[in-house]
């Protein structure tokens, strides 16, 4: 542009520019991840519908605790990702703040039209303290903190799947492209994609720790330490995006074999709490008394004395098959259809919300390009 190009720099600093560009880049990445989260939620709802009538083991203290519909498991993770979605949407409020005009630290004497600039960039026109606008990276750490929480939950899901695949053997069928064989042991089937997801979870948590460790030691104002934070953050986001794709496909291709699951649960009294609650409600007996009574029966039952349990059930006029299906009378189990429909309706509303955000950003981009051609 020649010598006149020297005028472009007035009222501008790399510090407020990079703070703005970083917000815009993060906003794009967050929206990409939001789309992936919505896709995972749809897959989880589909699985809840598919396995609504199939029994599934639920654990506490790494032991089978209770039984329930497999839909409950998938709806649990759908709720988790719904919460993550809400957090990510909330993070957009921080990313939409406009630091332009803040100069290097305390602002510029040049009066910028913040309303116009903000409108063109789809940013808020809220006036920020310049020192905060250029010297804070809380918005960056906040986004990575939310994404780290998502990875925490993914890490737990990975552990769940590894435990279930080993416990249920062929009860959980995993797609072949998620499995690798051993180079020397022909019997091995390794869940390699989940192992990678587990490693990436640890990487992201380590990266968050690195970001906070760098940030805590930086005196206020812009410092080049921030540049190192950017690299760490965007490498983590790449890992997160890849992991979300792995998990989505893993869940979508997962199959449960009901007969194998039932066989696995045969010698595990996951119905014990349901049974004493049921007897307490129909007999009026104190539940602690029933707890002690059934505990003694189960001590014998678990070492092979089946007759002790039969006598207990006969005493309260309960059939063996009835015991296995007691979980179905729980309020949540009886309202599974309603819970699934609620999750689906909520997802559809969230999809509309994101569509509106994307359409708004598209209009801003078109206006920006049109104005500066």
Residues covered by each model-derived region:
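Glycine-rich cofactor/substrate-binding loops
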Residues: 1, 185-373
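A helix-coil-helix interface module used to build multimeric assemblies
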Residues: 1-97, 101, 107, 112-116, ...
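Internal glycine-rich alpha/beta core junctions
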Residues: 1-7, 35-38, 66-217
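Generic amphipathic alpha-helical segments used as scaffolds and interaction surfaces in large
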Residues: 17, 21-24, 28, 68, ...
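A short small-residue
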Residues: 17-25, 60-62, 130-138, 180-184, ...
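Amphipathic alpha-helical coiled-coil segments
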Residues: 26-44, 74, 81, 88, ...
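Leucine-rich amphipathic alpha-helices with coiled-coil/heptad-repeat character
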Residues: 44, 48-51, 85-88, 92-95, ...
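Glycine-rich cofactor-pocket loops
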Residues: 49-71, 171-188, 219-225, 252-266
């Amino acid at each position: 542009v020649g010598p006149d190009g020297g005028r472009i720099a007035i009222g501008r600093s790399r510090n407020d520019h990079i703070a703005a560009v970083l917000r815009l880049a993060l906003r794009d990445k967050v929206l990409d991840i939001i789309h992936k989260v919505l896709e995972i939620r749809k897959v989880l709802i589909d699985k809840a519908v598919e396995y609504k009538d199939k029994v599934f083991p639920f654990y506490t203290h790494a032991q089978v605790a209770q039984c329930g519909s497999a839909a409950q498991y998938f709806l649990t993770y759908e709720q988790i990702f719904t919460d993550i979605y809400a957090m990510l949407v909330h993070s957009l409020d921080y990313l939409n703040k406009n630091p332009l005009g803040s100069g290097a630290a305390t602002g510029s004497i040049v009066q910028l039209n913040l309303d116009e600039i903000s409108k063109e960039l789809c940013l808020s026109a809220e006036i920020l303290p310049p020192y905060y606008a250029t010297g804070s990276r809380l918005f960056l750490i906040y986004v990575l903190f939310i994404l780290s929480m998502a990875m925490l939950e993914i890490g737990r899901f990975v552990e769940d799947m590894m435990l279930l695949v080993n416990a249920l053997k062929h009860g959980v069928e995993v797609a072949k492209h998620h499995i690798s064989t051993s180079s020397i042991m022909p019997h091995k089937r390794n869940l390699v994609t989940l192992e990678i997801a587990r490693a990436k979870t640890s990487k992201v948590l380590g990266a968050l720790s690195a970001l906070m460790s760098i940030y805590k030691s930086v005196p206020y104002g812009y410092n080049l330490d921030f540049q190192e934070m950017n690299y760490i953050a965007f490498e983590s986001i790449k890992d997160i995006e890849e992991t979300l794709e792995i998990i989505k496909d893993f869940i979508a291709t997962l199959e449960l074999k009901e007969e194998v699951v039932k066989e696995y649960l045969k010698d595990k009294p996951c119905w014990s709490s349901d049974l004493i609650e049921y007897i307490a409600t129909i007999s009026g007996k104190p539940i602690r008394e029933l707890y002690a009574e059934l505990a003694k029966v189960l001590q014998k039952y678990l070492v092979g004395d089946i007759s002790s349990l039969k006598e207990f059930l006969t005493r309260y006029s309960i059939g063996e098959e009835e015991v296995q299906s007691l979980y179905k009378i729980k309020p949540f189990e009886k309202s599974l259809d309603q819970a699934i429909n609620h999750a689906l309706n909520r997802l559809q509303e969230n999809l509309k919300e994101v569509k509106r955000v994307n359409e708004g950003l598209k209009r801003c981009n078109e206006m920006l390009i049109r104005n500066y051609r």
